[in-house]
Structures are given as C-alpha cells and as structure tokens.
Amino acid sequence: MFDLALSEAGAQIILATSSDDKYPPEHMIDGKDETFWATCGLYPQEFVIRFTSLVNINSVSITCYNIRDIKLEVNSDDSQNFKTIEQKEFQSSDSAPQIEDFSFGNVKAQNLRVVIESGYDHFCAVYKITVNGTAVH
C-alpha cells in the first residue's frame, strides 16, 4: 500500500473550484507539508484527484485548516456519476491544522472528489491529502 495521491505517483488534480498562483491546488499532492491550496471564500469548494489507473482506496487522510463539513465521493470511470463514501463534520481547531482520517474496506475509484461544503471562516486550506491503497490488476 502506498500514497496514490502524490503527483510523483502520477496523480493529477483535474478540477478545483478555485485557484491562486501562490496557493494552487497541485500543492495538496506535492508531498510537502509546508505548501497548501487556498480556497477563494465561497462554499461549496471542491477538487478532483485522478489516479493513474483504477485503484482500491483503503484510507484517506486530510491535513487542512478551517474546514467544517466535508464529503468524499468516488467514481470508477470518466463519468460525472460520483458516489458518496463519507461525510463528516470537522471540529474547529482554532489556529492549529485539522488532521482527519477516514478508513474504508476497499473502495474502487479512478477519481476522488472532495467537496468542502462549509468552513469555519471565509477561506480554508488543504495542506495535504494522502490516499492509501493499491492499484487494481
């Protein structure tokens, strides 16, 4: 099992609802702890990670800031038909980063969509998303 969401593993951000030249969405998958994606201040916000092939997702970990409600969705092809696999309300962490973990059996996916439905402030940030799993053979 390894991190399927790293850009060096071939993962790509194929959609993000906001982008800033200083804090682009690709920062979430660059493997660095100090970089991040910043949202533009309206909700909902979302991003989609495309994996290099069909994968089995075992767990997802998100390091973020100011997120209140989040939804994780997957699909196994290039359609827009996503299936919700988790919804959660995060606790406010004041000035500390939020680290949230999600565990699954084996969830098959080609794409992972993360929908930030609301936040504790106008802006939120995602520092890192880790997707542990294996390629489907």
In which residue ranges do the predicted regions lie?
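Disordered, acidic Ser/Thr/Pro-rich linker "stalks" and the adjacent N-terminal cap
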Residues: 1-52, 134-137
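Short, solvent-exposed aromatic-acidic interface loops
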Residues: 14, 65, 89-92
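Hydrophobic/aromatic beta-strand segments within beta-rich folds
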Residues: 32, 47-51, 57-62, 99-121, ...
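Short, charged/polar surface micro-motifs in flexible loops or helix N-caps
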Residues: 53-55, 78-79
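Short proline/glycine-enriched turn/loop motifs at strand-loop junctions of beta-rich domains
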Residues: 55, 65-68
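Flexible, active-site-proximal loop/turn residues at the rims of small-molecule/cofactor binding pockets
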Residues: 66, 118, 135
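Short, surface-exposed beta-strand/strand-loop-strand elements in extracellular ectodomains
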Residues: 67-84
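Extracellular carbohydrate recognition and processing domains
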Residues: 83-103
